[in-house]
Amino acid sequence: MNFFYYKDFYQLSEISVGQHYYWQISNFQVHGQTLMTSWFVISLIMIIAFLSNLNMKKIPLAKSFQNLAEFVTEFILDLARTQVGKEDYLNWVPFLGAVFLFIFVSNWGGALLPWKLLELPNGELAAPTNDINTTVALALLTSFSYFYAGISKKGISYFGRYVQPTPFLLPINVLEDFTKPLSLSFRLFGNLLADELVIAVLVSLVPLFVPVPLMLLGLFTSAIQALVFSTLAGAYIGESVEDHH
């Protein structure tokens, strides 16, 4: 072990909060590092999906992409059925599956891949979900989805839910629609940022074996955050399409 060995560990432990590598697109500035890692995550999901459909067998091998894909599909089907309801869940399996897989792969990619070794002119590469803009976009997409679900099924009568069970609850029910995307986005962003900060501090202090258990715990909490987000998204859609009496 020499100086350069420890230097690599300290480089991994560095974290730049609030610094971004900007791309200028027309009159807009966008976070370039977030777009790059988002494209990487989407490409990885598409590659695994493609490999899962090659040489499909009636009984897949235990260690195969097909077996993994079937397990994930069954999990998402069960999640959608439980949260949305048996009548409407099939329409929302693609959306909930896309949200869950994007967040899950993003979170695990941020925990497992040494993004910080790839240098940028400013800022650093990190999981897409480590950017508040990504989590807010996912939360707003969820909000639009449950509005669409309710209006497409019930029409204008969907808005009757705001005065149920009593008209006095109208302000609270309206406020709830604003707090849902806020809680979704800040919960996901805050948990991931806190996990990365804790691990970065511990790696800088004790760069060898002590942070490993926390990194494993980070993988677990990252998976839980993907599950929580997609479960709440399904629950909100389920509330929109259920019949109120």
Swiss-Prot record:
Entry keyword set: ATP synthesis, CF(0), Chloroplast, Hydrogen ion transport, Ion transport, Membrane, Plastid, Thylakoid, Transmembrane, Transmembrane helix, Transport
As for subcellular location, the record says: Plastid, Chloroplast thylakoid membrane
Principal place where this protein is found?
A: plastid
Q: List, alphabetically, the CDD domains matched.
A: ATP-synt_Fo_a_6 (cd00310)
GO cellular component terms, alphabetically, are: chloroplast thylakoid membrane; plasma membrane; proton-transporting ATP synthase complex
What the entry lists under InterPro entries is as follows:
ATP_syn_F0_a_bact/chloroplast (IPR045082), ATP_synth_F0_asu (IPR000568), ATP_synth_F0_asu_AS (IPR023011), F0_ATP_A_sf (IPR035908)
Cystine pairings recorded for this chain: none
GO terms for molecular function, please? proton-transporting ATP synthase activity, rotational mechanism
Q: Where are the transmembrane segments?
A: 34-54, 93-113, 132-152, 197-217, 218-238
Instruction: Write down the membrane topology.
Output: Multi-pass membrane protein
Function text: Key component of the proton channel; it plays a direct role in the translocation of protons across the membrane.
As for family, the record states: Belongs to the ATPase A chain family.
The record's note on quaternary structure and interaction partners says:
F-type ATPases have 2 components, CF(1) - the catalytic core - and CF(0) - the membrane proton channel. CF(1) has five subunits: alpha(3), beta(3), gamma(1), delta(1), epsilon(1). CF(0) has four main subunits: a, b, b' and c.
Q: What is this protein called?
A: ATP synthase subunit a, chloroplastic
